[in-house]
């Protein structure tokens, strides 16, 4: 594939895995500048965007690029302003020939895995995360002696990954020779599949079972993957039996992960389970203030107050709003005021009268309209009287919410994201070809928005 084809595919996958607001604001217009020497240089329009993407989206973009090209590279976002200095630094470097990368990279035990900004010192503590922070610090201070496994769950962008990186940094600061691996369940699955294909399963097992600390993110994505669950079960057992620390994160507690083997579920519950909840107003303000101090920015308190009052869901969106404001101010050439802040964020802030639409809201309205029970949206029934309303509900979930395709599939009985894509395409085509049906869907959309 050419670099353009690679990046087109990366963007396609990113649109599925990243919230629509973040994708449209920060990812959509990025360009792949170069792909060499195990590094992907990605061009963005503004330095603010580059800094924020490097801090917050490096891991997920690294996983997506891996899925597309089949070997690991580290993404690095740079702005157009930084491009000249980057080229100057690299003009004298000799380009190394491409080599075939093994699916097993056993040199990923050090601090290079972790975002340098994600430490315990930069983690802002509040009522919603105090207990997870304390548990993570205890684990980092004494791996396998405090809580093993440590299971952290909570919504997107609340700080689970930050805590996992902080644990990694802390362990390696205390024990530089410790073997620590941070991965996601998706990356674990992809490496496992590739190891089977390349006849490297023993090397794969050596990598993941002969370590001191395993940090695995988004474990919920191993649901429905029987072979991966089998492999992870044995990996978990060997690490635990050898008194090695395991830290797991998820968007839900073990008991709510559908199609997870009971033997894995019970092991996840052996140690300590902690949940992170959305930050309160004081914590949101503290996060914004810490951010502007780190970046040495001058933003009026009333603008920060506006952001903290309007963005309440998670930290990632909070910091994203700040980055968007800075970019907007620079592009408009205007000083930051409350009025400019409201103008900059109008597309991502709901009006006071509006309510964030959930998939359950959509299922309820569509179910009432077509006389389908809520539970039937998640059932395996394929009769047309149920299957077609289910496709309509999937279509509306994609159109009216920021949930990723896998998340939408989960809410419809753990269906694969390709099923959601198919449903969206089918309903979109039916809308184009049938004016009566188009009006029907528009009426449903109005009812959902107005409930």
UniProtKB/Swiss-Prot annotation:
Localization of this protein: Cytoplasm
Mind listing the UniProt keywords for this protein, alphabetically? ATP-binding, Cytoplasm, DNA replication, DNA-binding, Lipid-binding, Nucleotide-binding
Region (Domain III, AAA+ region) residue spans: 113-329
For this UniProt entry, the molecular function terms from Gene Ontology, in alphabetical order, are: ATP binding; ATP hydrolysis activity; DNA replication origin binding; lipid binding
For this protein, the record's PROSITE patterns field holds: DNAA
Q: What is its main location?
A: cytoplasm
Stretches the record annotates as Domain II: 71-112
SMART domains noted in UniProt: AAA (SM00382), Bac_DnaA_C (SM00760)
Q: Which Pfam families does UniProt cross-reference here?
A: Bac_DnaA, Bac_DnaA_C, DnaA_N
Q: Where is this region: Domain I, interacts with DnaA modulators?
A: 1-71
Example GO CC term: the record gives:
plasma membrane
Q: Which InterPro entries match?
A: AAA+_ATPase, Chromosome_initiator_DnaA, Chromosome_initiator_DnaA-like, Chromosome_initiator_DnaA_CS, DnaA_C, DnaA_dom, DnaA_N_dom, DnaA_N_sf
Domain description = Domain I is involved in oligomerization and binding regulators, domain II is flexibile and of varying length in different bacteria, domain III forms the AAA+ region, while domain IV binds dsDNA.
State the protein's purpose: Plays an essential role in the initiation and regulation of chromosomal replication. ATP-DnaA binds to the origin of replication (oriC) to initiate formation of the DNA replication initiation complex once per cell cycle. Binds the DnaA box (a 9 base pair repeat at the origin) and separates the double-stranded (ds)DNA. Forms a right-handed helical filament on oriC DNA; dsDNA binds to the exterior of the filament while single-stranded (ss)DNA is stabiized in the filament's interior.
Record's protein name: Chromosomal replication initiator protein DnaA
Species of origin reads: Staphylococcus epidermidis (strain ATCC 35984 / DSM 28319 / BCRC 17069 / CCUG 31568 / BM 3577 / RP62A)
Q: Which gene encodes it?
A: dnaA
